[in-house]
Amino acid sequence: MKNLLETNVYDVGETMIIAGTCLKYMQPKAYEELEKMPGEIYEVCLEAIHVNMVITKLIGMLSRVNIKKVIFASVDKSPHCIQLHYIESEITKAMPHLKTEFVHYVALDKALKEIDEKTIKMSKNLGGLQVLLKE
């Protein structure tokens, strides 16, 4: 596993796996699933650094290298790690013509569970969630 922010913007392949630093030791079985996926794993801890630093770094990488797929993976229920899943939205706003595929996973019950874009967007919309829960 490489540190994302310490990686040169040109030193990336076609698939990047970006995982919360704690995933490896908090959910080792789920992390093993990540290790079986094609691509290099990059770690980032959003308790230690601001999400905007990660967004800027990834935009730099995506604008220089033909990255076909970015996978985000985190532990579930972390107020910090959830920000990993918001990065796609910020990147696509800055780079609307980007053709990179984004996939999101959370580690749940010792396994990775894919999370869809609608769920991620709704997690940022507390008012909308409140309405849904009241129905």
Feature roles, as predicted:
Residues 1-135:
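Iron-sulfur-associated redox domains of electron-transfer enzymes in respiratory
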